[in-house]
């Protein structure tokens, strides 16, 4: 019964799959017959080919078929799959060797002899003492450290020479040394009796560390260094950091010693030599790091100072209260003075920079303290030397030097020179304010110009400017010996590009005969910037004053000139309105109307400016051309803030050439209130809803599945087969039957649509023919009716 039910259940509709116990069938890949070919040839182990390693690498092309190892079933034992039971391995039938049987070596006699020789040599080497491999150990290792190693590794004193050398050196090092000579108590290098090439001198007796000389006790410091007559070419005094002079030998070589110690300490597996490990590790670190010249990684070599004459020495600083000298070989024929910052409390320091030309330069560095000065002179290869004067003992941050005829520098404080600015303002007013509307400004400028035009002595103002005379304070007047050439020294200057230019804090001039003078702004409260006076030369210098950082000095903003201002403004300068407002900010209150009125006359279009430029190149004057014609600009220069204009406020010229009618214009401007609105697009009311679908029951065949909604019931496939066919249009027509008769009369093949029609209706070709009987009766009756109607 049970088997019958199982079979019925398996044969039920939709259950065509086989039971579970029928799924595990033997593989079809393996052949049952011996000579039968497999369905999958790669699975046949008899056809496998074994190749060497790398022959299956096809990344760089096909490998060459040479030296290919091919193993067939006749040459190699391959695993075979058979349907029979497992067979015994043929190797298992061989007799196994007994455990006590002697296994003979597979090495050749030559290999055995070589192996025995190597073992013999190793045994001889290991039989010696471990320290015998280092014959120079006593020379490279310190005696105290070598003694500690020998105590642990050679307690029986087999190395007699090493013990004797170590004990003798230990006795010599235990001798007391004098204080200051050997602070470390180790190897001391005796000073050689021969001259040494490079030495450092002893320190000065003063407390200066960085070559900062003491302040001079006298108000005048006149130094005239001359080239030395000895063989010493370079003198550079540098103070040492300690009280003992240092020789500059190369640093001791401890790398070899440390490597020997590391190899010896490897024998100390119990780490008994902790004292020996520490210096070894320390030396290893110091030898790896780069050391500065003159410094030693361990700091144990302290040589004595040499007392013999030397070839190259570094001169000691003088013990007198005179400024120290620091001569260096200059690149040109003149000496350069270097004035470093002093650490004392008097005055500022002067410093010169080396020049690439034959002109020496002095730079006035910002003083760090109040008083004192330091002078560092350099020797020259010629007999000429320039000296740097000491500033006066007054609290002045900016000095105004006047180069006199004798070459002495005079320093004095003077009020600022405003003649150039007054001339500039007066010329601007002549150009821009020809009607003299700004009367107050005209009066002030003319008054200032009159004051500056007072007669002066010829030796005071060579260029028509106020001369600054030397002060009456105590000022050093060094008189240098000038060479026969025209080279001059410059104070507080930058490197000039010419050889015949003297500049006071000058910028590189664009021409060869002009130099710009520029005063530095003072950092005090009640001092003003000083304008220097140029020397008596044929070159004219230009003044560029800066704004002083003081509270009681008026600020003047002159225009940055594009050409030298010494030509008294031969061309009208191009000045902007904002720049004029800054010039007139302090003297007179400027308003927007004044600026706009002054600029109204100067307004020109771009084409007119190009025309004036072209006429100016030909030699014509712009003002003369303006006087010939009447320029009435349509648009005035305005400085109002820009704002957005509406469409109604636009001028008629900005509108399109195609004008609108009155009705269209009213309609166009009436829509202005709707322009700012945002048009919201209507939201999509339709939202797609997810519908769960199903495709059929799992027990049905996939061919019978149909896409349906999850809530719809399934359709029985049997009912689909029993469903009657829908009536066709061709069933009641006369044409298909007549067409069938035509096909039969001709002997052609019957079309499929006619065959299906006759099969659906159950007709045969002989039973249904044309003419049809009912059709004949119908047409006969119709003819009778038509004939009766005619009668």
From Swiss-Prot:
Q: Where is the composition biased (Basic and acidic residues)?
A: 274-288, 333-342, 449-462
Question: Which residue ranges does the record annotate as region Disordered?
Answer: 195-257, 274-409, 449-573
At the top level, the lineage of the source is Eukaryota
Biased-composition ranges for Polar residues? 349-358
- Name the family the entry cites: Belongs to the FAM47 family.
Protein name, please?
Protein FAM47A
Q: Which organism is it from?
A: Homo sapiens
Highest lineage ranks of the organism?
Eukaryota, Metazoa, Chordata, Craniata, Vertebrata
């Amino acid at each position: 019964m049970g088997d019958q039910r199982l079979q019925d259940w398996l044969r039920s509709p939709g259950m065509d799959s086989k039971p579970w116990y029928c799924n595990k069938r033997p593989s079809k890949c393996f052949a049952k017959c011996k000579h039968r070919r497999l369905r999958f040839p790669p699975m046949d182990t008899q056809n496998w080919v074994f190749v060497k390693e790398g022959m299956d690498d096809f990344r760089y092309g096909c490998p060459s078929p040479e030296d290919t190892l091919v193993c067939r079933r006749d040459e190699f034992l391959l695993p075979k799959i058979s349907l029979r039971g497992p067979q015994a391995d043929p190797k298992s039938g061989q007799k196994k060797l007994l455990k006590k049987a002697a296994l003979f070596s597979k090495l050749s006699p030559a290999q055995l002899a070589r192996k025995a020789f190597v073992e013999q040599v190793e045994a001889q080497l290991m039989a010696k003492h471990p320290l015998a491999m280092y014959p120079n150990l006593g020379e490279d290792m310190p005696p105290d450290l070598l003694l500690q190693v020998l105590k642990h590794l050679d307690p029986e004193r087999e190395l007699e020479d090493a013990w004797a050398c170590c004990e003798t050196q230990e006795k010599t090092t235990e001798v007391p040394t004098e204080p200051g000579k050997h602070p470390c108590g180790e190897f001391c290098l005796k000073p050689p009796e021969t001259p040494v090439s490079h030495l450092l001198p002893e320190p000065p007796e003063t407390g200066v560390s960085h070559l900062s000389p003491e302040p001079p006790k006298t108000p005048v410091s006149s130094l005239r260094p001359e080239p030395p007559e000895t063989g010493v070419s370079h003198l550079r005094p540098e103070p040492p950091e300690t009280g003992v002079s240092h020789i500059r030998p190369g640093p001791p070589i401890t790398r070899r010693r440390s490597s020997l110690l590391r190899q010896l300490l490897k024998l100390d597996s119990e780490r008994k030599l902790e004292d020996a490990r520490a210096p070894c590790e320390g030396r290893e670190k110091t030898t790896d790091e780069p050391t500065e010249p003159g410094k030693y990684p361990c700091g144990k070599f302290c040589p004595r100072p040499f007392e013999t004459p030397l070839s190259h020495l570094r001169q000691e600083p003088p013990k007198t209260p005179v400024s120290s000298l620091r001569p260096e070989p200059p690149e040109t024929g003149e000496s350069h003075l270097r004035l470093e910052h002093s650490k004392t409390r008097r005055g500022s320091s002067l410093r010169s920079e080396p020049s690439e030309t034959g002109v020496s330069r002095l730079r006035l560095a910002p003083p760090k303290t109040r008083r004192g000065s330091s002078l560092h002179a350099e020797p020259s290869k010629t007999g000429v030397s320039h000296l740097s004067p000491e500033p006066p003992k007054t609290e002045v941050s900016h000095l105004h030097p006047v180069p006199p005829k004798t070459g002495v520098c005079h320093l004095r404080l003077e009020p600022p020179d405003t003649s150039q600015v007054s001339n500039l303002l007066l010329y601007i007013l002549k150009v821009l304010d020809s009607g003299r509307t700004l009367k107050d400004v005209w009066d002030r400028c003319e008054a200032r110009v009159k004051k500056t035009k007072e007669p002066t002595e010829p030796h005071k103002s060579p260029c028509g400017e106020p001369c600054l005379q030397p002060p009456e304070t105590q000022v050093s007047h060094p008189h240098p010996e000038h060479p026969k050439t025209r080279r001059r020294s410059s104070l507080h200057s930058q490197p000039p590009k010419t050889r015949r230019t003297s500049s006071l804090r000058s910028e590189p001039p664009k021409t060869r005969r002009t130099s710009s003078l520029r005063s530095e702004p003072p950092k005090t409260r009640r001092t003003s910037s000083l304008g220097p006076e140029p020397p008596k030369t044929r070159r004219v210098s230009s003044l560029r004053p800066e704004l002083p950082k003081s509270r009681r000095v008026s600020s003047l903003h002159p225009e940055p000139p594009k050409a030298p201002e010494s030509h008294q403004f031969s061309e009208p300068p191009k000045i902007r309105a904002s720049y004029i407002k800054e010039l007139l900010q302090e003297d007179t209150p400027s308003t927007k109307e004044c600026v706009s009125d002054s600029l109204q006359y100067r307004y020109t279009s771009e084409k007119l400016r190009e025309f004036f430029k072209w006429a100016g190149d030909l030699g014509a004057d712009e003002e003369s051309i303006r006087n010939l014609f009447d320029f009435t600009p349509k648009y005035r220069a305005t400085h109002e803030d820009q704002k957005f204009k509406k469409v109604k406020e636009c001028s008629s010229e900005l509108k399109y050439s195609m004008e609108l009618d009155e009705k269209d214009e009213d309609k166009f401007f009436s829509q202005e209130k709707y322009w700012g609105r945002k048009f919201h697009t209507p939201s999509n009311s339709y939202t797609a809803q997810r519908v769960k679908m199903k495709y059929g029951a799992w027990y049905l065949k996939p061919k019978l599945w149909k896409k349906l909604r999850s809530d719809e019931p399934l359709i029985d496939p049997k009912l689909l087969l029993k469903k009657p066919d829908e009536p066709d249009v061709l069933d009641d027509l006369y044409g298909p039957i007549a067409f069938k008769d035509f096909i039969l009369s001709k002997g052609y093949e019957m079309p499929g649509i006619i065959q299906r029609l006759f099969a659906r209706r159950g007709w045969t070709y002989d039973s249904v023919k044309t003419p049809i009987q009912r059709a004949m009766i119908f047409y006969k009756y119709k003819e009778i009716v038509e004939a009766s109607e005619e009668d």
